Amino acid sequence: MTDYCIFNISWMSDRFGCETGNEDVQECIDKSPNGSPTTSTTHRRQNSSSGLEPARKRPKLSPPVLTAMPLDLTDAVSPNESQACTSSLKGVVTAAGAAQMSVADRMTSSSVAPPLCIVPRSVEFINPKTEDMSMDIPMGNVQSEFTGLKCRVCGDSRAGRHYGTIACNGCKGFFRRSIWEQRDYVCRFGGKCLVVQEYRNRCRACRLRKCFTVGMDARAVQSERDKHKKNPKDSNNEGSTSPQYPTASTPISIPSTSTSQTPTSSVNSYNFQNIPGIVSRSFSENLIMRDNSVPVMETSQSAALSHVPLVRYLIDLEKATDNLIDENCDFMSMEFDQLCRVDVTIEAAFRQPGVVAKRTPPRWLALERLTTLEDVHIAWCRSFVLCIDYAKIMKDYQELSPTDQFTLLRNRVISVNWLCHTYKTFKAGCDGVALVNGSWYPRDKELQKQLDPGCNHYFRILSEHLMEDLVIPMREMDMDEGEFVILKALILFRAHRRLSEEGRAHIKRVRDKYIEALYQHVQHQHRHFSSVQTSMRISKILLLLPSIEHLSQQEDDNVQFLALFNLANLNGLPYELHSSIKQHIPNGDDSDDTQVNEVTSNNDGPRSSESSHTPQSVSTSQFLEFKPSLH
């Protein structure tokens, strides 16, 4: 007769938080010491209110009413103790037998069915802190591989056991970084935010609070960190690209993408090993990298496909810029007047772009709703900050003098901005204009009728030019990310007559380097191309540059019109950048050491606001030390 082990259902009920008040209890068969099976019958619990039938005896080998789920045990005991459970198991095991079944035995014995843990179908694992810790199986050592379990923090269906509870990789990583870096979060809504998978990044304070509520153990994180400290060999391996998560007090840096084997070229003379931090400490204060289960600093798929070091660097730089955000900021959770402001001077906005707009996560590809006049203002400000952050990161930009930095960026930021809108519209498959805050302007005439007339005046002509002259050509050639980032750098580094002689010479060298990188990238991505086809593709890419300039000039007129009638809140900084005054940069220094934290002047029309003296607790003057003024 087949041997069976007694499975204590009441123990499993206590162990996994199961309620067995009205469940059937099976008849178990035990192997007695003399070898003869003895039968132990338990009776059904009777609930008078439920109207259950009287208990009746089931056949000995009938399956229980409960669901069998495979239990994965990770070397809880030594192999010598694994003999406690015989090879004749047919799906029901004792608690002690389950604890003593080693992974090695299960892997080597193909005739043994995997151990089964009998639990009700509707059971969800409870907080391990409320479990009876005197039980035989140490749940902290169990690696859950169950299918269908949900993260107890956000509800993600792809979950496992991490830090003492059931959690997904995203919440696991968020909890680990929060503990390691001792982060403090504040909820703006009284700690009542709903933490679900779709919006789990919206409020980090409530997310961390829920991590503790469901039983995540901070001590497990600290012990894991101690293990890493004791075994630092992985971090010292040559060519290691382990991500570094910056805190508010540490500068952020782009990982090196240099390789030991690269083609001999002037492009390879680019010094990737000595790339400075993206921003100084004062600039990175209150900034974090976006919380994702996948580290944001890892090389993207497009970068991995490119064998040109400069292209890989530019792609990583693009990713780092997009993932540089302020804490507790989101387009959906912030009030309109808290997101952005335009009553600042150009100099102050370039020194401290975070004053113009909060660094909310870019949502180019969302396309969740049609744009409004408020979206025009918010998207303009957020896109402006993205462009400023991008330029300040670049080593080639940092090598310019402070005055040349200001002159170049002031005249190129609008064109860089529109290239970003164009490429993101292309990637989103949008028939119109995709905006950074998740809204979009439609090209369809019927949809345009639903919008504010100010939106149509701003975007109607722009959307036609953008689609016909830029997006459609990008679709036809299927532009990749490497070509986009090179084109973006070429738009930024365009010589201007008011640059110094050294600045113009530097920009010429930089442009030659980027064009050569573009040629190498196209050659590698399209190896079947002939030299004529390669040249044709590069020509088509470079021919997009005049269309970008034309689009920027068209926006200049639209912004001036809306600012004149005080529409879309585009007076002040947008008007000043788009107006003809941006071409005039007088000589002389301004002794005003203004740092913008709060601007007290009122900007009631299309003019620049006055500077104001504010406390110097916020300062980035050591990073960008230009002090030109406009009169």
Swiss-Prot record:
Give the chief site where it resides.
Answer: nucleus
Q: Which GO terms describe its biological process?
A: regulation of DNA-templated transcription
Name the DNA-binding stretches. 148-223
Bias (Polar residues): 33-51, 596-623
Q: Which UniProt keywords apply?
A: DNA-binding, Metal-binding, Nucleus, Receptor, Transcription, Transcription regulation, Zinc, Zinc-finger
Which segments show compositional bias classed as Basic and acidic residues?
A: 222-236
Compositional bias per record (Low complexity), positions renumbered to this chain: 246-266
**Which compartments is it annotated to reside in?**
Nucleus
Zinc finger annotations (NR C4-type) as residue ranges = 151-171, 187-206
Q: Which Pfam families would you find in this protein's record? A: Hormone_recep (PF00104), zf-C4 (PF00105)
Q: Name one GO cellular component term.
A: nucleus
> Which part of the chain is the NR LBD domain?
306-581
Q: What does this protein do?
A: Orphan nuclear receptor.
Record-stated family: Belongs to the nuclear hormone receptor family.
What is the official name of this protein in its record? Nuclear hormone receptor family member nhr-34
The organism encoding this protein is: Caenorhabditis elegans
Q: What is the lineage of its organism?
A: Eukaryota, Metazoa, Ecdysozoa, Nematoda, Chromadorea
Gene name, Swiss-Prot/TrEMBL:
nhr-34
